[in-house]
Amino acid sequence: MDYQKIINIAVIAHVDAGKSTLVDAFLKQSHVFKDNEKVVDCIMDSNDLERERGITIYSKNCSVTYKDYKINIVDTPGHADFSSEVERIIKTVDTVILLVDSAEGPMPQTRFVLQKALEIGLKPIVVVNKVDKPNCRPEEVYEMVFDLMFSLGATEDQLDFPVIYGSAKNGWMGEDYSKPTDNIDYLLDKIVEVIPAPTQIDGDPQMLITSLDFSNYTGRIAVGRVHRGVMRDGMNVSICHRDGKVEKTKIKELHTFEGMGHLKTDMVESGDICAVVGLDRFEIGDTITDFENPEALPPIAIDEPTMS
């Protein structure tokens, strides 16, 4: 894998704007599923509570391949109760896709997440979704997004954001909302055109744990983006806990994301998102780092998602 061709993106929006549906469209277009496999809509909503409520609570990781690019995609919560989850995730990506409903426009939660993305210097790609709705107003919604970004202090470059129109549900994206296409290639082309590849940083390894996964076979799995250096399968590492304590442990397996699943690998370089298997004790916000010279990354705020 050419690590200059890895792109990390997050999909952010208010609840019901179509985030999970868009991620599903990425996966379907990239032929993640075989012809005889049944594709369940809202593939990313795998948690039982999420399927029951029809909203995304926890961030998920998957990846698609497009024109020799590996695109790591994080589908983030859109519900206001989980804003810290969103804030945590956008710090691991190269840019965000800001998805807005073509009838409703940007909502309060959109404002919060967008502000966080702008503050750390990300330039969003704006997708005006659901343009097939009879009450859609895509041009007005575009102006609303521009005005919102301006009010949030966006730079001149950030205000020059690309905008794509389409219907994730119907599997198309294009430049003109009045001219439906038959795929989402226009959005994928825009992603690889405007998003810079991650910068590789040499040195002792560092990875901030930004989310957790779980396997019945291996237990808890640490997920995050390698910030510096190289993580290797079987290497001895230190875990710098948020309270300042440092523990020594060993990586049993390293996985990258491929489609909806994990792919075991020997090494992961800086800039890629990976899953680390076999660590003893860890939490979100801890740093996996060099065994001999442990160096923590700045911690992140944690709020446990709760729903009534």
Task: State the predicted function of each range.
Residues M1-V100, E104-P106, M144, L212-S215:
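P-loop NTPase switch module centered on the Walker A-proximal segment
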Residues A17, Q29, H79-A80, A103-P106, ...:
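Conserved nucleotide-binding/hydrolysis micro-motifs of P-loop NTPases
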Residues N61, E85-V86, V113-L114, H262-L263, ...:
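Short beta-strand/turn micro-motifs at beta-sheet edges
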Residues V96-Q158:
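Conserved C-terminal guanine-recognition region of P-loop GTPase G domains, centered on the G4
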Residues E119, I164-Y165, A296-M307:
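Flexible hinge/switch segments at interdomain interfaces of large molecular machines
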Residues I125-V128, G171-M173, E304-S308:
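Short, hydrophobic beta-strand segments
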Residues F150-I284:
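Conserved catalytic-core segments of large NTP-driven translation/proteostasis enzymes
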